[in-house]
Amino acid sequence: FQLGKRVPVEAPQGTIEVVEFFWYNCPHCNAFEPSLEAWQKRLPADVVLRRVPVGFRDEFVPQQRLFFTLQEMGLTDKLHARVFAAIHVERLDLSRGTTIASWIGQQGVDKEKFGAIYDSAEVGKRVREATQLQDAYGVAGVPALGVGGRFYTDGAMAGSMARVLQVVDYLLADVRSGK
């Protein structure tokens, strides 16, 4: 799907940004994560993957804050997959700040430092920007991917989540060729 207007990207000049829109509670996002991880490992140097937690409703905000706090603390690589596992395998409720704080402490993270960043204005700003980006791409469900600020695809459009990354690879070629 080609967007009617270009969406701003954060990727450095000379690179193409792919945005994954996700929600930690989404079982489809959880199932897609291993495929996305494998795809990310083989990305060419001119492609940058950015993960963006969606905020369809107010209930999504604690997990948006969780993601951006992990990112701010440099813990995304260590804990991103663990958040999915905590929710989908261990069946923990990580939908509120209090339960998130309890879980984060069990991961060996300084709860006070985490809490200060979680409640910070900077994380609040990033949550708002994420929701604005999701709206600019017209995200209706997750997981979904934006490509180069010009294209958008998801499992329904591609026929399955298994085909989404093939579609993204095709769209990357289009962006590179200037189409």
Task: State what each model feature region is.
Residues 13-15, 63, 141-142:
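A structure-centric signal for secondary-structure junctions around beta-strands
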Residues 22-25, 40-43, 70-74, 87-91, ...:
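Sec/Tat-exported extracytoplasmic proteins
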